Amino acid sequence: MSFSRSSMSYSSSGGGGGGGTMSMRSGGGGGMGMGSSRFSSMGGGGGGGGAMRSGSVYGGAGGSGVRISSSSFGSGGGGGGGGYGFGMGGGGGGGGGFGMGGGGGGGGADMNVSANEKATMQNLNDRLSTYLEKVRKLEAANAELELKIRQFMESKTSPSSRDYSAFYAIIADLQDKIQAATRVNGGIYLSIDNAKLAADDFRTKYENELAMRQSVEADIAGLKRMLDEMTMARSDLEMQIEGLKEELIYLKKNHEEELLAMRTQMTGQINVEVDAAPQEDLSRVMAEIREQYESVSAKNQRDLEAWFQTKTETLNKEVASSTEVLQTSKSEISEIRRTLQALEIELQSQQSMKGSLENTLAETEGRYSMQLGRLQNQVTSLEEQLVSLRSDMERQGQEYKMLLDIKTRLEMEIAEYRRLLDGEASGLGASSSKSVQKSSSSGLSSSVSSSTVSSSSSVPSSTTSTTRKVVIVTEEIVDGKVVSTSETKHTT
């Protein structure tokens, strides 16, 4: 947004036969500044002279350091003569200046436009056309610069305009490789989980088989103890059989000795006649007793042999079955050990493969992260270049708007000057001074111009009269266009 305020003062005085000068100054600043213009005319005659100063406002860029000067005027009458001068300067993106001067003589308050002044106006118009031509050239250069910036942005700096088609195939290939590696990694993880489950299953089976083996070994130990007990019982029975055999032999020996004794006793013939009951036959009784003992001994021997044979067969069967179970358990344990060793070897190979794949995955992720970082840095640098170009474009746009604003204000001031000059050429009756104050902004702006016209007419040298006319011009400007104008006139 730019704000400019200008003031213009105009004063004139005329006499009968003197000379007068008139000058005009105009200044403008770029950006936010305040400029001032001054227009004055002086004339003097034989009897007196006139001079007028009007208030003006000066300020620098930004609207700071404002100094306001007061205005005063005076008039006098006398003989005639006059001169006219005009000057203007402009600052900002471009500027121009012109001046004119002339002299003449006459008696009266009217101002005549001479041929000199027409030439000066022609020069002024030529300079204005030159200034407008420069403005057009600046606009064309600005448009060309904007076109070059736009082309540069479209060709170089815009990320969307860069041709990344050469990288699409590489990116797609890398993405396919990443997906394949991810699938392979997932399959490996699944295989590892399956191997862990199988290892847990085999560990459970191993523990069950180990418990069964321990129970079988405990049974075998119990059977061994039972076998030892049976062996000891067998040896005891054999010892008892041997004892019984020895006792039987001893009994047989005693029986034979008794038989021999009885026989020796029976060999002597004793004839004793007694009246007694008939005696039993001792040999028959002894034979019966012998048969009875022999039958009992044979029966006991048969029973012992049968019991021993039965127990021996039972123990042999149990030992054979236990030995078979033990051999089966040993073969199963050896098979389980071989399976466990194979699974442990496979687990170690899978773990080593997992470690190598994890290292490969980490290296791949690191490499792609580095590439992504480089691409991100490139994108960041391109974004910074884009931001700087946008800021340059905005700055140039603001400068262009400022130049357009200055051009508009200068055209308005030139139009106002032309209107004043046309008003003077149409024959104003008195010298006039006019002050125009304008204020503008980017939106709605209004301008109020106050004109003070003072004239002094020369009557006979003995009498001098002064007439003051005040003209207040109010203009409403929207976006550099005059919307409404109103004038108020006062005469004092």
Swiss-Prot record:
Residues 117-152 are annotated as: Coil 1A. Residues 13-34 have a biased composition (Gly residues). Keywords: Coiled coil, Intermediate filament, Keratin. Residues 1-48, 426-470 are annotated as: Disordered. Residues 263-285 are annotated as: Linker 12. There are two types of cytoskeletal and microfibrillar keratin: I (acidic; 40-55 kDa) and II (neutral to basic; 56-70 kDa). This is Keratin, type I cytoskeletal 13.
